Amino acid sequence: MDAVDSTRAFVKGVKRVIIKVGTAVVTRADGRLALGRLGALCEQIHELNSQGFEVILVTSGAVGVGRQRLRYRKLVNSSFADLQKPQIELDGKACAAVGQNGLLALYDTLFSQLDVTSAQLLVTDNDFRDPEFRKQLTETVESLLNLKVIPIFNENDAVSTRKAPYEDASGIFWDNDSLAALLALELKADLLVLLSDVEGLYSGPPSDPQSKLIHTYIKEMFEGLITFGDKSRVGRGGMTAKVKAAVYAAHAGIPVVITSGYATNNIIKVLQGERIGTLFHRDAQKWAPVGDVGARDMAVAARESSRRLQAMSPQDRSKILLDVADALEANEKLIRIENEADLAAAQQAGYEKSLISRLALKSGKISSLAKSIRVLANMEEPIGHVLKRTEITDGLVLEKTSSPLGVLLIIFESRPDALVQIASLAIRSGNGLVLKGGKEAKRSNAILHKVITSAIPENVGPRLIGLVTSREEIPDLLKLDDVIDLVIPRGSNKLVSQIKESTKIPVLGHADGICHVYVDKSANMDMAKKVVLDAKTDYPAACNAMETLLVHKDLVQNGCLDELIVELQIKGVVIHGGPRASSLLHIPEARSLHHEYSSLACTIEIVDDVYAAIDHIHRHGSAHTDSIITEDHEVAEIFLRQVDSSSVLHNASTRFSDGARFGLGAEVGISTSRIHARGPVGVEGLLTTRWIARGSGQVVDGDKGIVYTHKDLTSHA
């Protein structure tokens, strides 16, 4: 998720950037300065300044700050009788004069904390009528930028001669948005960023769920179609003013991005090429609009198709899965060809062996996937299952039944087999599905998606399962909390963390797979060797592979640990040690005890007893899967009861923590969450519940005449 968006590739050539921050961002709803937002703004400018960018700031807010201060001053100097009189609106010029001092003093304080120097430049509309002024202004700004000083511009409203409506034909600029656009031209900026109190330009009011964020503004496409709301609650501008300024600058060849000033890192993201906010660019009409038909339409289509799927009989839903399994086997040769093309590209690109291993659809994999789908098809019908049946009162019966969640968004990295498992689970559970796989498996995912959706009957439709092919659509999808019901990320810690930080939609999954095997002093060592080797070497890249081997201290003294290490090394496993093991065994110390290798490597640490092992797991584990090898059943029960992980095993490999091996048919992922599903997530984890009541005219009427029986009828369901 960190590649530059194709429409934002121009940012690589940006050096001089003008940032305009409006009053709605500078101040809070009560008129006071928004210190948190201003602090975040200054930190971003400092970071850009240190990276060699030339940053110019255009700020609003002086009038608002001054008004708040003067109102307070007037209040403390007023008698009770004065307060009863009609209040006269404060003069805006006086507010500007008072507020300018306080606003710039705050900027100076914040920048000083970051060892950044700032300079104040107040301008008026009339100043720009003088060519000599423009020349001197440019020279001054150039000097400041060469000294790494941040020029801070604001219109000098205290002495401005212009009056409302501020848009007469004689004006050179009318607000700080148009001032920023004018400065972008005068100072030859490479980019103009206009910070707003919303995420960008929407097709309608941002509060309307049907309004879409426009990522790239194309005048010919959107002019006349966009509905603007009110102007800014505190300033002279608003979105209309920002769009006019952006169109003006973009027409002159300066790209403009309108984005939210409320987010703490948006300016950095814009300059990293992320597709946030709305871009105005002179060449925008030449670009194919990216994602304009994508995100919401795909999710809505998946929901509509899922409702048709739910309306089918259980037998018909099962038949779809059987048809999918047959289609996979019938197209195995074509699937393997596309997968081999992905593998060749990954090897040529120099990807890590662990990623290439996850990417490969090895011999027999398609048959194995088809078999698991058939098992899933023949499982008990999961939808509409009556979990509880209660008689509320005579003639009124309430049922708690299983029900699909709705629409799932699954984001996964390099495992194309995950697409098959997830799609089959979605069909079985009656859910709509939107998939986004890793770019390294692009061809494999495309052919698998085509084969699977081709097997879905027309009365449900292939749009039951959508496949996102562009990274740029992910941020849009993550905002659709009114359409998408659950996000399940499958991949690296970085991927899962990014998803959790970027959405309001519930997220199910795990960030790490730090799985432990603890070999107790009473372990059968032949069994221990077999289990440890399987847990580490059967599939080192899997999230349920052993990453840390814990051994009882007695196994050091009797030489059993040495035997385990030799067996691991014979299999090519690179050994790292915890602090204790590293010191005693003279092996390289692990960089962290919370580390997922996803390769033929592991950490070994020595512990005093089962309680120390449990403590280590709780401190350094990820609540995924942990196993104990012991012949002492009392010790085993302590471990099984006290280790707080989603799957805990006794005398068995961590590799058993898998949906298919647990008999779930397949899994959509493994969850370490404590809410909803936990552990391998199969069909049941993709269901919720709802209540269905069947009555015969009952009314509450203040509970008069109602005799509540609350009789449990579950056994009769």
From Swiss-Prot:
Q: Which UniProt keywords apply?
A: Amino-acid biosynthesis, ATP-binding, Kinase, Multifunctional enzyme, NADP, Nucleotide-binding, Oxidoreductase, Proline biosynthesis, Transferase
Is the keyword ATP-binding in the record?
yes
Location of the region described as Gamma-glutamyl phosphate reductase in the Swiss-Prot/TrEMBL record: 297-717
Which InterPro entries would you find in this protein's record? AceGlu_kinase-like_sf, Ald_DH/histidinol_DH, Ald_DH_C, Ald_DH_N, Aldehyde_DH_dom, Asp/Glu/Uridylate_kinase, G-glutamylP_reductase_CS, Glu/AcGlu_kinase
What cellular-component terms does GO give this entry? cytoplasm
Which organs or tissues contain this protein?
Expressed at high levels in leaves and is inducible in roots subjected to salt stress.
Regulation of catalytic or functional activity:
Feedback regulated by proline.
EC code(s) of this entry: 2.7.2.11, 1.2.1.41
Where on the tree of life does the source sit, at the highest rank? Eukaryota
Q: Quick one: which residues bind substrate?
A: S60, D157, N176
Catalytic activity as recorded in UniProt: L-glutamate + ATP = L-glutamyl 5-phosphate + ADP; L-glutamate 5-semialdehyde + phosphate + NADP(+) = L-glutamyl 5-phosphate + NADPH + H(+)
The Swiss-Prot or TrEMBL record annotates one GO molecular function as: glutamate-5-semialdehyde dehydrogenase activity
Residues engaged in binding ATP: S196, D197, R236, G237, G238, M239, T240, A241, K242
What PROSITE patterns has UniProt attached to this entry? GLUTAMATE_5_KINASE, PROA
Recorded hits in HAMAP family, A to Z, give: ProA, ProB
User: By what name is this protein known?
Assistant: Delta-1-pyrroline-5-carboxylate synthase
Upper taxonomic classification of the species?
Eukaryota, Viridiplantae, Streptophyta, Embryophyta, Tracheophyta
